[in-house]
Amino acid sequence: MSDKEASDKRIQEIMDHPSYRLAYMDQDFIRGEDLRPLRLEMELLKPEMCLDSLGIKSTVVVFGGTQVAPLEEGEAMMAEAKAALEKSPDDPNAKRMMIRAERVLYKSKYYEECREFAKLVTNHNKQFHDGEFIIKTGGGPGIMEAANRGAFEAGGQSMALNITLPFEQTPNSYITPGMCFQFNYFAIRKMHFLLRAKALVCFPGGFGTLDELFTTLTLRQTGRMQDIPIILYSKEYWDGIIDFQFLADEGVIEDSHLDLFQYTNSPEETWDVIKEFHGFKE
């Protein structure tokens, strides 16, 4: 090997080494533990800058269960459960499957009602074209899909904040392209849910919905965020899982904290609460 060939080889080895990469193009570097503060900052900034450029001023945040299915899916689940129970009437798993299928089918009404609510909100923001009251969800299936779908069917925009999970989660197809953001950090995602929020509507859901609800209640309780209507959709459902009055009776929250939220039972009532809170009529 000539001296030039040896020199060229050494230069190539230098340039191929990760240390030579531009810092912002070095994924191993960017993903390192020491760079977590930078990743947190970027995850906060990217959606903020995008939404600013799109003129999105405020949102209506909709939470709810991923397992709240549209009617046809609920009916299919019920048919499957019935068939399994008829085949093995003494099987405890088949009995349990039947109970769950009955409840999923019952809750399918919430999918349709959420869809209708999102249409009401979207028809308003379409009328004024001012970047206000844009539907925002977590981007998944169930209630989140219903809200994005309602906005889509009304011919308007809606956005979503998706999250990376150990199991694959893809965004639903009704989100407006260019308005779906993927997050790695739950904390930054939660912050973005509330930064532009002018209302929070919690449809029936599980741990994730409860997490977002109690985060918002805590921030309102402590005066750490803007005053917004916090709406629990379906008093029947929420009374069944949380006894808020018990918390007040036990003295662990103030009686006044019960005024931080309210219940609604129809799409129209829910939208009326938001309109009244913000002082506008249609």
What are these regions (language model features)?
Residues 2-4, 8, 12, 276-282:
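C-terminal amphipathic helix plus adjacent low-complexity
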Residues 8-9, 14-158:
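Glycine-rich beta-alpha loop segments
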Residues 52-55, 127-129, 152, 172-174, ...:
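Solvent-exposed alpha-helices and their adjacent loops that cap or buttress functional pockets
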Residues 77-79, 152-153, 215-220, 246-250, ...:
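Short, solvent-exposed amphipathic alpha-helical segments in soluble enzyme
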Residues 136-203, 214:
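Phosphate/pyrophosphate-binding betaalpha-module
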Residues 155-168, 203, 217-240, 256:
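Short, acidic/small-residue loops that bind anionic groups at enzyme active sites
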Residues 184-231, 278-282:
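Active-site/ligand-binding-proximal alpha/beta "capping" segment
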Residues 232-282:
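C-terminal functional extensions of proteins
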